[in-house]
Amino acid sequence: MLNLFVGLDIYTGLLLLLALAFVLFYEAINGFHDTANAVAAVIYTRAMQPQLAVVMAAFFNFFGVLLGGLSVAYAIVHMLPTDLLLNMGSTHGLAMVFSMLLAAIIWNLGTWFFGLPASSSHTLIGAIIGIGLTNALLTGSSVMDALNLREVTKIFSSLIVSPIVGLVIAGGLIFLLRRYWSGTKKRDRIHRIPEDRKKKKGKRKPPFWTRIALIVSAAGVAFSHGANDGQKGIGLVMLVLVGIAPAGFVVNMNASGYEITRTRDAVTNFEHYLQQHPELPQKLIAMEPPLPAASTDGTQVTEFHCHPANTFDAIARVKTMLPGNMESYEPLSVSQRSQLRRIMLCISDTSAKLAKLPGVSKEDQNLLKKLRSDMLSTIEYAPVWIIMAVALALGIGTMIGWRRVAMTIGEKIGKRGMTYAQGMAAQMTAAVSIGLASYIGMPVSTTHVLSSAVAGTMVVDGGGLQRKTVTSILMAWVFTLPAAIFLSGGLYWIALQLI
């Protein structure tokens, strides 16, 4: 691993290590901030002792990161404007990452201190938007162009819809349990709160099978949280390494000859598709703003711009850099690897835009999606040591600081305490919803999904909600995004003035 950092001066190397420490610290905060949601119900219902529940959550968080894949990781990264990603120098890259992470850390620590289940996902996304907007203002470019609106819209849709889904499904489960699993003394046990059970039976722990269901669903929430939120940390680490230590990370240096050939074949097949459908790139070119004029005085650094008009030239350059018998990326110089990454990202971006054009068949959309996946297979990756580091940070963070947010979830959302059935319904809803989102590559908020699910169970069960707590949570939700935008944007502007 250490040989990949060869070539960096001491100053840049120290800053790089500091940036990586920031990312892992952010993930640790994410662990004790968000994973409190996973253990709140299982602790409050006395299904597990707090210490054991937290260790279990840390364990399943760890394996959620390891097995969760990378689709969410790069969905977050692609929210940044493509030109900003491709043209940032090392110093600007560090300023961007430090500003983004510091803003997220400040807000997450603040909401955790007050016990508010605010969303780490919303915080991170707001920080990314703040960077994009500040970059647009400083460079004089369009604010609309500064944001990758396609990715931002898709991610915002998932963040808005997921809490509604959580509220409705969890409430629906309670309705079904009340309707079909009650009426007898034995069945009514799951609709009690721990204090009621202790008064009547002298026991505070739930019935055996109810307890098993609570533990399994809590483990599911922790695993899904790791699979979704852990990927965001992986994406941030890769963003740092690609920007600061490009020699070993801009492409997968461990890629096999087969994987490189698959990448080249995908580019060739995309070229054939464009040749068979010449009207599509023409439509796309007409929709895009013109390329910026090139500098002729030699004083301005030439920037790399993605534009559909350059697609065939870009494809030709890739085919030149990747001959058919290439077995490794080692023969390419660092500048060639960086150039290859930029070109591949641009070709992929063009492919994604083509798939969105009206008149493109479903079959062609699936073909373009498959080609994009193959093109980026050696570009969008993460070494095992990075996945392990993020998993450890999230797992360790889970075991500290969970109590504040867990008390809010378990005791302060509803006017009555949480019943066993409500805990099961909320956790099952969150585990399945977040797990599905991770599978399709959509970042969602564990906090929002589970908090909404708990609220849904309370409303349907007739217990009502504590207005003060719910108002505080909603205010935190509403202000998280603008606060993160202003924090990261302001920090980024200050950082750029100092360098």
Curated annotation (Swiss-Prot):
Keyword list, A-Z: Cell inner membrane, Cell membrane, Membrane, Phosphate transport, Symport, Transmembrane, Transmembrane helix, Transport
Membrane topology summary: Multi-pass membrane protein
InterPro entries hit by this protein: Phos_trans_PitA_PitB, Phos_transporter
UniProt source species: Escherichia coli (strain K12)
Other facts noted in the record for this chain: The Pit system in E.coli K12 consists of two transporters, PitA and PitB, which can transport phosphate independently of each other. Both proteins may have contributed to the kinetic values and substrate specificities determined in earlier studies.
Induction of its expression: May be repressed at low inorganic phosphate levels by the pho regulon.
Protein name in the entry: Low-affinity inorganic phosphate transporter PitB
Observed phenotype of the null mutant: Disruption of the gene does not affect tellurite uptake.
